[in-house]
Amino acid sequence: FWLSETPDVPSKGWDAVLPRICSWGHFKCKDTGFEFLFFNLHMDHIGKKARVESAFLVQDKMKELGKGKELPAILTGDFNVDQTHQSYDAFVSKGVLCDSYEKAGFRYAINGTFNNFDPNSFTESRIDHIFVSPSFQVKRYGVLTDTYRSIVGKGEKKQANDCPEEIDIKTYQARTPSDH
């Protein structure tokens, strides 16, 4: 669905500079019957209202797409804001979602996820988030900055503006590598 006032129609939302979407899936474990929803998005980098309204839209869609079952959900993506911004609060303030960083029993995160294309930078700013329903137990959380130094070929270094994150949720393991 589109992160806009008209989520069923390709569109830019609110004050967004670019059209943005949220992809989702409904999953069911064959062995246990456990069901959950998984969402991934890339929020606008400029539109403040778009980010806040998108946060509320995604949470409304979680309820709608669960078809009355109140299924647990995982939401990943590049949110283009860190843990100090209003749109981050919009995700965690309703009690529908928790930040896996905050919920984790163990954190391997010596750096945040935003590096502005500088592999030597240090930041506590986390713009890539993994949010989970309160029913999930998050055992470990990691920001894997070692990927900055991966050899791509002939001595070239891999460049990225965000760090991959990895969490282990109960018996499920999720890895969200950043695409940029």
Which residues does each PLM region occupy?
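A short local loop/turn or secondary-structure capping micro-motif enriched for an aromatic residue
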Residues: 6, 46-48, 147-151
